[in-house]
C-alpha cells in the first residue's frame, strides 16, 4: 500500500502528517490484500476552511471522498 500526501496553501506540522498517515493506514486494512493499492491524499487550507480529498485506487477499485470543515483533523476523519 502506497500513501502519497500533497499539501496546498499551508505547511503541515509533523503531528498532522503522522495523524493523517495513521488514519489512512487504518482505512487501508478494510481493503484486505488488494494488490497495487494506492492512496492519494490532498489537503488544502483556505482562509476559513480546510479540505481533505482522498482517492483510493487499486486493482478493480477506484474510490474518491472529500470533506471540508474549519478543522483539518475533522476533515481527515
Annotated model-derived regions:
Residues 1-77:
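N-terminal, polar/charged subdomain of small-to-medium soluble alpha/beta proteins
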Amino acid at each position: 500500500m502506497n500513501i502519497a500526501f500533497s499539501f496546498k496553501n499551508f505547511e503541515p506540522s509533523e503531528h498532522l502528517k503522522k495523524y493523517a498517515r495513521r488514519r489512512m493506514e487504518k482505512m487501508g486494512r478494510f481493503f484486505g490484500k488488494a494488490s497495487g493499492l494506492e492512496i492519494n491524499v490532498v489537503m488544502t487550507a483556505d482562509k476559513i476552511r480546510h479540505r481533505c480529498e482522498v482517492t483510493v485506487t487499486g486493482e478493480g477499485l477506484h474510490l474518491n471522498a472529500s470533506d471540508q470543515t474549519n478543522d483539518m483533523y475533522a476533515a481527515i476523519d
